[in-house]
Amino acid sequence: MKQTMYKPKRSFRRNLTPIRRHLSPIGSGDRIDYKNMSLISRFISEQGXILSGRVNRLTSKQQRLMTNAIKRARILSLLPFLYNEN
């Protein structure tokens, strides 16, 4: 007689640890705008590059709006394209 080997069934219970939602660094009253320099400066690195969405903890829509606002501010000379080390 041939015996078959059965795998034990896995239980599909999830861990009961609560999932923490990360709060957005942009408040509900803050508007993403190229004129809002205090907000924009938080999302630019020391070299002047735009920080990624993972580093910023922004949603993809917020990151897209922030990128466009930073680029507009650079074109209008409100922000430098690169920060000099000197």
From Swiss-Prot:
A GO term from the CC aspect: chloroplast
Compartments, record wording: Plastid, Chloroplast
Tagged with keyword Isomerase: no
UniProt keyword terms in alphabetical order: Chloroplast, Plastid, Ribonucleoprotein, Ribosomal protein, RNA-binding, rRNA-binding
Superkingdom per UniProt: Eukaryota
Gene Ontology BP annotations: translation
Main localization category: plastid
Subunit organization: Part of the 30S ribosomal subunit.
Family the entry assigns: Belongs to the bacterial ribosomal protein bS18 family.
The protein's name in its UniProt record: Small ribosomal subunit protein bS18c
Species annotation: Pseudotsuga menziesii (Douglas-fir)
Gene name in the database record: rps18
